[in-house]
A protein has these predicted regions:
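Glycine-rich dinucleotide-binding loop and its adjacent helix/turn
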Residues: 100-108, 217-270, 364-366
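Local sequence-structure signature of Cys/Sec-based thiol-disulfide redox active-site neighborhoods
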Residues: 10-42
Length: 414
């Protein structure tokens, strides 16, 4: 397809359905903005009748929903998958970004940080202040898990609390202030076999004297057929994105930790009833979150239970649970199911190169960030199976940058 000129691209019909406080909507718009295209934004929360219009056009009950011309792209994950596969630019009718030519030398940096979030951005701040001129491969889903967090109340320095996206924007600006270069693309390959270490994105290669892995973690799913079949049709892992779509309805949250309780409390703003389904008879979340949820009149707990099936044909109409002690089953009438059963580390890229523990977390020298490979450091949720907090992630990001700086000095790298 020949590339369109700027005016043709500007006039191309791109529609994105969004709502307020939707992190994936913000990420989708940022990706489209990076392509130099304009779009029409339809806020289904503030514009009457637009929710039903979106559902009719897309068959989905999640935001964002993106249409490019006559093509229904889907949500942010679909948009970013097209970008990673090199399919987005042709659909937009624009020339692709710079493509590495055969034999062309990779771009070299003293420090490359793979991943963003509080760990990656903190590592970048410290590395940049040490004049190491770091490159951050932030990923298309930049900012880590905090981008999906409504309120952060336990990070020092924010007495009134702060939203996750707001906090990550501040981290990013601080990193850039000191000279960090940020690329919002996914790393497709990492080579730790020899120095300089290699990192690839879709169409470019980079090398680094020191590598910091801050790849974070991703939400776990139940792994049942009905969950996958009804994904984005009432099944979600992002209450801030999709909760308001089910205003006045009953909903369910699966899980018993802080994330599940936070989701339940947020959903209670919109729902008539929120069922929290937990496989144990006690919660794992912090005391203050437990108290808030247990005392909330709209939240009902379904103890000692697991989800056997998400019920529904076209959209979610219920959830079938089973008590793990009595084997008794019941069906709860809900129109949305939010999964909050924990996370797993994003370590697939380096699985056969770096030592991992049995759960897939990167192992490091005790008290440090050094992996089993000299010059490769790890921080954040990718190496922390215990705490998994924003403040501890930031702390390990600091450690990784300092460890990398000292190691480079020992190697005589300038």
């Amino acid at each position: 397809m020949p590339g369109r000129g700027p005016e043709e691209m500007r006039l191309m019909s791109i529609v994105i359905y969004t709502r307020n406080s939707c992190p994936y909507c913000a990420m989708a718009k940022q990706l489209l903005h990076s392509k130099g295209v304009d779009w029409t934004e339809i806020n289904i929360e503030t514009q009457a009748g637009r929710r039903d219009e979106m559902v009719e056009r897309s068959g989905q009950l999640t935001v964002p929903q993106i249409f490019i011309g006559e093509t229904h792209v889907g949500g942010f994950d679909d948009l970013s998958a097209m970008e990673s596969a090199g399919e987005l630019d042709p659909l937009l009718g624009r020339a692709s970004g710079p493509v590495e030519k055969a034999g062309e030398a990779a771009e070299h940096h003293r420090v490359i940080i793979v991943g963003s979030g509080p760990a990656g951005y903190t590592a970048a701040i410290y590395a940049a202040r040490a004049e190491l001129e770091p490159l951050v491969i932030a990923g298309l889903q930049f900012g880590g898990q905090l981008m999906l967090t409504t309120d952060v109340e336990n990070y020092p320095g924010f007495p009134e609390g702060v939203t996750g996206p707001e906090m990550m924007e501040l981290f990013q600006k601080q990193a850039e202030r000191f000279g960090t270069k940020i690329i919002r693309e996914d790393a497709t390959a990492v080579d730790c076999s020899a120095r300089p270490f290699g990192v690839k994105i879709a169409d470019r290669s980079f090398t680094a004297d020191a590598l910091i892995l801050a790849t974070g973690a991703s939400a776990k799913w139940l792994g049942i057929e009905s969950e996958q079949r009804l994904m984005n049709k009432g099944v979600s892992a992002c209450a801030t994105c999709d909760g308001a779509l089910f205003r006045g309805k009953s909903m369910a949250v699966v899980g018993g930790g802080d994330t599940a309780l936070e989701e339940a409390l947020f959903l209670a703003r919109f729902a008539t009833k929120v069922f929290v389904i937990h496989r144990r008879d006690s919660l794992r979340g912090s005391k203050i979150m437990q108290e808030r949820a247990l005392d909330h009149e709209k939240i009902e707990f379904v103890w000692d239970s697991v989800v056997d099936e998400v019920v529904g044909e076209e959209f979610v109409t219920g959830v079938r649970t089973r008590n793990v002690k009595t084997d008794q089953t019941q069906e709860l009438a809900v129109e949305a199911v939010f999964i909050a059963i924990g996370h797993e580390p994003n370590t697939k890229l380096i699985r056969d190169q770096i030592d991992l523990n049995s759960a897939g977390y990167i192992t490091v020298v005790p008290g440090r960030s050094q992996t089993n490979i000299e010059g490769v450091f790890a921080c954040g949720d990718a190496m922390d199976p215990v705490y998994r907090q924003a403040v501890t992630a930031a702390g390990t990001g600091c450690m990784a940058a300092i460890d990398a700086e000292r190691w480079l000095a020992e190697q005589g790298v300038e």
